[in-house]
Amino acid sequence: YCNNSYTGQLVSYAARNRLCSIVSSLDGGGIAEGASTRAQMATAWPVIDEEYFELLDVLSAVSEYSHDIRRRSRPFTVVELGCGYAHWLTTANGALNSIVGTAAPRTFLGVDVVPGLRNSVEEVAKLNVGMQGTTTFHAGFIAPGGVVTRKASKGQAFITNMFTKSWHVANNGSVVPTVSLPELFRLHRLPCVIDLLDADVQHSEYSIFTREIVSMLTHSVRRVHIGTHGYSGEDPRLRALFEAHNWTTVWSYARSTKAGPPKPTEFGPVRFADGVLSFLNPRRLPVLAKHCEMTTELAW
């Protein structure tokens, strides 16, 4: 499935992103700088950045689902927190069509703090086979217990306005609600097995994933991918939380400092704009699926 057209688009995007990142990091910046610039750019290939690892997790989730003997009795399910235009939901959908087929059942939930993205996500769903009618957009914040302070509420309004401008969508003045992760799952009646929970929530990851939430996820979520935005000490604490529940750490890379060197990985040196944390549930998919079949009500 790595040769399909949808992955070609992703590779083009990643190549452009990586190239621009390299150029912007050069002192004086500019491709016309000469041989030293060309040498730096030459050593940066293959194209690897934080989104490469996100793509690996998406494709791995689809591959695991394709080998699940109970897949005909449950939909492939992905939740994307901080979804924007639903880029990763679309990627998962394309991979599912390629590996399992367009008739495969699926459930996609995209969550973002910008309500104006709803029309864009719905339009994307119309343009991709299998997404229309199976993709839901939820406008809102996620917080422990679904409760925020007045100070945090003001901060949320600022964040909504800021990202509304970033996404170039209309701001209708809507105040988006705040719910907890279990409330979100109940609200949208998600299946009790979720193949992938993908979170890119601009530093809120450290408050969303509490001990109680990780415990809940252990009973129902197969794989978690988190784009991290913290600094020294924050990622290890989050990693320890999952490992305390026996999750396996698949990827763990802190974000790069602007002046610091690229971080070594098994794929070569990488400069991470966001950090990467990826976890795999110790409970195998058949175990989760069997529990789902025995449960008369949703796990949430």
Predicted feature descriptions by range:
Residues 1-300:
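Phosphate/nucleotide-binding beta-alpha loop and adjacent structural elements of enzyme active sites
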